[in-house]
Amino acid sequence: KLVNYVTALHQATSRSYIDRMVDDKVNCMLKAKEYEFDYWDGNRRYGYGGYKYIAGRWKPVAELLIKNYNLNNDSSVLDVGCGKAFLLYEMKLLLPHLKISGFDISKHGLASAKKIVSKDLFIHRAQNPYPFKDKQFDLVISLGCLHNLEIFELKVALKEIERVGKQGYVMLESYRN
């Protein structure tokens, strides 16, 4: 089922795509692919250009996921490629007893997560087997992560998402690999 939860967030900020395309693209991409400080909070040419928590920004997405996947305080959610885990944080604000887990390859991203979710986050690659039981999570989400994988890695990641989740929501912005 094709659903769109995130586009409104992307349209809420201005972006200069042309400026980013005429930059030293190869070197910028190599720096961004490290997924550390420069990607998250460094110059915009490498990634987000300052990915800060804005109270309530992810709340509409969290509400839609909770509603559409029938989540409650007894549910469990895994976020594959959670970054700074702002969506998991907003979900915890709405459902304080929601069991969450999230992983990312970025030490900087995970270190920037809010305290109430940070204990449930760990370093892991989306394309490696997940350390969870079959159907352990009521919902597995992945937003803005999988398009960074090579095709052979993507196949493993999608199989793992299907294996550990009863339901899944995957967002792909683009796929250029």
Regions found by a protein language model. Give the residues of each.
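Class I (Rossmann-like) S-adenosyl-L-methionine-dependent methyltransferase catalytic domain
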Residues: 1-69, 74-80, 84-133, 149-163, ...
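Short catalytic micro-motifs in class I SAM-dependent methyltransferases
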Residues: 144-145
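A conserved beta-strand element that flanks and buttresses the S-adenosyl-L-methionine
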Residues: 141
